[in-house]
């Protein structure tokens, strides 16, 4: 199978946790003998912010961990259209711009030979349905939804049996427990603040419990505003 995956970025995971899942899936497909190409904008905001924070060296860990992966960059639809024309399947992630999602749908309606799927890994269809309705999915063959609740929303929107649940998971070839027993101390949280969408949950289920039992807490992530950093300081995190 020849697969084209159109993503916001494969190179950067800055506030883009889907990149970890996508890298693992694409590498696994390559290992099984499929031809895989990823496509991303020339200057996605995730890459821009990663380089701003860490310089070009910030891109090195991805290249070292996934030497078999590469992504083609594009400036406009014409640069994307020709290479995709030979694909058997094209998957379009929902972090792409609405104009691009619509353009690929039009191409499929006009006879493009590939199967075209929309990949939704966010909760906006539930929490902010109008944001998802901005995407013109006319011409798409189906939807990949990251959970059953999200899939049910698409079924109500008329997608019926053309919705498939595709849970995200860790790439265990890279993320796994230590092979040998080591001394472990404290608690580590890896994640972003999330524009206050989960600040109450972090306070209730992470910060307070860790402080209550005196457990050292290390946090890794981006987009922690001043208020969030003050909350972490109060909990000695």
In which residue ranges do the predicted regions lie?
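Active-site regions of enzymes building and remodeling cell-envelope glycoconjugates
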Residues: 53-57, 140, 160-163, 229-237
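Nucleotide-activated donor-dependent transferases that construct or modify glycoconjugates
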Residues: 1-15, 42
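Short amphipathic alpha-helix
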Residues: 18-29, 204-206
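Extended catalytic core of nucleotide-activated donor transferases of GT-like folds
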Residues: 9, 23-24, 37-154
């Amino acid at each position: 199978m020849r697969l084209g995956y159109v993503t916001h970025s494969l190179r950067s995971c800055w506030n883009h946790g889907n990149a970890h899942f996508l890298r693992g899936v694409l590498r696994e497909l390559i290992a099984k003998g499929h031809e895989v190409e990823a496509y991303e904008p020339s200057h996605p905001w995730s890459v821009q912010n990663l380089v701003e924070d860490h310089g070009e060296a910030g891109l090195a860990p991805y290249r070292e961990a996934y030497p078999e992966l590469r992504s083609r960059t594009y400036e406009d639809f014409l640069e994307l259209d020709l290479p995709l024309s030979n694909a058997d399947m094209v998957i379009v992630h929902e972090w792409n711009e609405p104009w691009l999602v619509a353009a690929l749908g039009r191409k499929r309606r006009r006879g493009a030979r590939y199967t075209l799927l929309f990949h939704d890994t966010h909760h906006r269809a539930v929490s902010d349905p109008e944001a998802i309705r901005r995407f013109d999915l006319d011409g798409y063959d189906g939807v990949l939804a990251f959970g059953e609740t999200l899939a049910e929303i698409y079924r109500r929107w008329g997608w019926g049996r053309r919705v498939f649940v595709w849970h995200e998971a860790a790439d265990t070839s890279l993320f796994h427990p230590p092979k040998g027993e080591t001394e472990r101390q404290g608690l580590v949280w890896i994640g972003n603040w999330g524009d206050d969408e989960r600040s109450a949950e972090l306070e209730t289920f992470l910060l307070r419990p860790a402080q209550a039992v005196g457990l050292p807490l290390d946090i890794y992530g981006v987009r922690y505003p001043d208020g969030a950093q003050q909350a972490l300081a109060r909990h000695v995190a």
